[in-house]
Amino acid sequence: MFAELAERSDLEHAKPYAELVRKAADLGFAKSGEMLASMPFHDEMSDSVFMATPLVVKAGKLTGERKYFDLAARHFAFMQKLVLRDDGLYRHSPLTEAAWGRGNAFPALGLALALSDFPKDHPAYAHMMAEFQRHIFLLAHFQDAEDGMWHQVIDQPGSYAETSATAMIGLAIERGIRKGWLDPAMYQPRVDQAWRAVLARVGNGGQLVDVCESTNKQNALEDYLHRAAILGPDPRGGAMAMLFATEMADLP
């Protein structure tokens, strides 16, 4: 939020927000200035590709300091080594191979946001872009052809259709199309189907259908399959639906 405020405010009002972005990104460096292997506090789950990578990239954009782009690339590589499965999907954490829905939506959206601000001349850009495109290509094959949804566990079609993951993946794909990273002929129909699916699961009063509850590291596939699906208001799912809406509306 404060990264967006830093970009959208006038110069005088942007300064405190930009400073917050820089301070958060600086957690990835030791007191000596040496770059850490990953961003601390949130580096054990695939969520971290979303939680940390775009923020650190934004610090690079706001300050013009290349070290932040280097850190973002290093953090992404660290997380891939930790949670990327051999088949290209992401496990949520090393505790289990389960490809949790939101645990794959986080890397998809995190990379889409990070690449939007990442310099094309950086040595890591080509790899990060290739990984984004590869992951989206794979995720597309797991979209439910009937209702346009992705599921609570990506490769378990018997798990419930999950709204927040669908919104996040749809958003990531739409961003990729808008930026010219993804082929519209291949992906726009999938985005449109996902958008209709999300619209059908968001009520006029903000009620949501089938949003997975807050989920920490779980010990087994069955734990993800049995996570509660929220019926009602949920800030997490609502935020992702709103972000998807702004992307579909092509808002700056």
Task: Please state what every model-predicted region is.
Residues 8-12, 59-70, 114-126, 176-185:
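Inter-helical turn/loop segments and adjacent helix faces that build the functional surface
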Residues 16-37, 66-89, 129-147, 190-207:
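Long, well-ordered core segments of solenoidal/helical folds
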